[in-house]
UniProtKB/Swiss-Prot annotation:
It comes from the Eukaryota. It comes from Arabidopsis thaliana (Mouse-ear cress). One of its GO terms (molecular function) is structural constituent of ribosome. SUPFAM superfamilies: S15/NS1 RNA-binding domain (SSF47060). GO terms for cellular component: chloroplast; chloroplast stroma; plastid; ribonucleoprotein complex; ribosome. InterPro entries: Ribosomal_uS15 (IPR000589), Ribosomal_uS15_bac-type (IPR005290), uS15_NS1_RNA-bd_sf (IPR009068). GO terms for biological process: translation. Keywords: Chloroplast, Plastid, Ribonucleoprotein, Ribosomal protein. It is found in: Plastid, Chloroplast. The keyword Membrane does not apply. The keyword Plastid applies. This is Small ribosomal subunit protein uS15c. Part of the 30S ribosomal subunit. The lineage of its organism: Eukaryota, Viridiplantae, Streptophyta, Embryophyta, Tracheophyta.
Length: 88
């Protein structure tokens, strides 16, 4: 599933690097990579800080997308297999 998403995003990479979906996709890849790194290196506090910053950026982008286009937001959440934003 993830490999198919990567391939579809790679095909669209040249024309849509600035799109919200591509940015969320790249942040999600960074988050997964940092999470696996932190499982091995629990006391790497700089990586923990970087992970929190990337999580915040992704959260802001997802909030923006959910306000602007709810259908694209739902599709992206399902494709990347991540949870929805908590509503207040």
């Amino acid at each position: 599933m993830i490999k198919n998403i990567v391939i579809s995003f790679e095909e669209q990479k040249e024309e849509s690097r600035g799109s919200v979906e591509f940015q969320v996709f790249s942040f999600t890849n960074k988050i997964r990579r940092l999470t696996s790194h932190l499982e091995l290196h629990r006391k790497d506090y700089l990586s923990q800080r970087g992970l929190r910053k990337i999580l915040g950026k992704r959260q802001r982008l997802l909030a923006y997308l959910s306000k602007k286009n709810r259908v694209r937001y739902k599709e992206l959440i399902n494709q990347l297999n991540i949870r929805e934003l908590k509503t207040r």
